[in-house]
């Protein structure tokens, strides 16, 4: 009896860390359950809004230990879409994203701060236009659970703002238009 109890305790202690580890997810871009949208003030009177149509990524997440989360995202900057072909051509030019030279933007998390109630700050290295700088994303875990197709999903929203000049974007649109606001909607399917 003592041997069985000892074996159960040892076995349980070895399995416990695995049960508490983060699950790995792939961002569900194919099912259109994720989006990366942006807005920039237009002369201080309105906003130009747009999105990136082609991106991919993955993340690890455990609701019991959000600080262990990891996020990796790649964005095809050629896929920028502001609903205006001529403007998109200009955004892809050397004045803005310089997609001929830098066709990809990336975000790789370096830390996650748990703020409670599903809120967190995800800090990482954001590379855009060939420049890499730290960027903090205010994020919220929306929910997670089984889907109707037998998979398991986790969803998040996030926002961040950055100055265009910090990423070597040459075009000066004036002080009212100096920053880009990103809105992120992410739904991942557990691998």
Swiss-Prot record:
Keywords: Periplasm, Signal. Residues 1-22 form the signal peptide. InterPro entries: Lipid/polyisoprenoid-bd_YceI (IPR007372), TTHA0802/YceI-like_sf (IPR036761), UPF0312/YceI (IPR023480). Coiled coil: none annotated. It is found in: Periplasm. GO terms for cellular component: periplasmic space. Its main location: periplasm. It holds the Pfam family YceI. PANTHER family: PROTEIN YCEI (PTHR34406:SF1). Belongs to the UPF0312 family. Type 1 subfamily. This is UPF0312 protein Shewmr4_1178. It comes from Shewanella sp. (strain MR-4).
